[in-house]
Structure formats: C-alpha cells, structure tokens
Amino acid sequence: MSEQEQFSIVVVKGSVRPGNYTGMAVDLLVDELRKMEGISIEVIDPIGMDLKLPGTGNSGSAERLQELVEGATGVILSTPEYHGSYSAAIKLVIENMGFPSALAGKPVGLLGVAAG
C-alpha cells in the first residue's frame, strides 16, 4: 500500500443495552485497528441516532449513515447473539442504509458476540 492509499472502515455497534459486551468487543477491535497504518475508523452507535422503521420515511441520521457507508472502503457490523439471530438494533441500522443498500458492493465483516 502506498502512502496515499488509505482504508476507511465503518464499524457499527449492534447493541444498545448499557454496558453491553458487543460494545466492549467493538472497542477492542477499534483499538487494534487504530494501531495499523493506513486505516481510518468511523464508529456508528445507533443509540444516538434517530433511525426510523422501514417505510416510515427517512431521517437525517439515516442520510448520515448512508453517506458514511457509501464513502467507506469496508464495513464491520457487530451484533450480540439473541436467540440464534442478530439484534433488532443492527437490523434497524441495515434497514436504514437505503435501497439499493449503501452496503451494495462493499466488503462486510461480521463481529458476533455471545455470552453464557
């Protein structure tokens, strides 16, 4: 990678529970990624966003989310495991990425967290 090349990674926190393990795992991941040269990181936390239910209109938060993802080289989605599936929070984030999705054509990494 040349000096001018830079990867831009968007990391999405997929849990809104206070003190959640998913957020802790994301923090560890981001700390490690920031040690690497040529990588910029943007963390998206849905807890501070005004994301709408699908079909009920768009919000400024959704537009900002779409801009960040469209401008990124890649995306990492994190989620706790809830009853064998992903969280409602990460689903809502994905639903607010527009149609066609801002994720289209992007490399996506998944960070799953399960306790117990």
What are the residue ranges of the model-derived segments?
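Short, glycine-/small-residue-rich phosphate/pyrophosphate-handling segment
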Residues: 107-116
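Short, structured loop/turn "capping" segments at alpha-beta junctions
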Residues: 101-106
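N-terminal beta1-alpha1-beta2 submodule of the flavodoxin-like/Rossmannoid cofactor-binding fold
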Residues: 1-99
